[in-house]
């Protein structure tokens, strides 16, 4: 599965992940037990899991 994080400036990242959580004003993306991304919520326009690579 992939996590797609789209930023307000229309850029995005696409990384291998299986869980997304929000905590303390951050979007945190996990792959198993590993934290693979942490982004301030104010910079994000969308964040979701996808089964296909975009």
PLM feature spans:
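Short intrinsically disordered terminal tails
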Residues: 1, 52-54
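Short, mixed charged/polar active-site loops
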Residues: 12-14, 36
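A short beta-strand micro-motif
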Residues: 1-9
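Short linear/disordered segments characteristic of secreted peptide precursors
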Residues: 11-12, 46
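Core beta-strand residues in small-molecule sensory/regulatory alpha/beta domains
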Residues: 29-30
């Amino acid at each position: 599965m992939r996590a797609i994080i789209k930023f307000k400036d229309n850029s995005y990242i696409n990384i291998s992940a299986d869980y997304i959580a929000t905590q303390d004003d951050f979007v945190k993306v996990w792959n198993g037990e590993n934290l693979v991304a942490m982004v301030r919520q104010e910079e994000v326009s969308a964040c979701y899991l996808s089964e296909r690579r975009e």
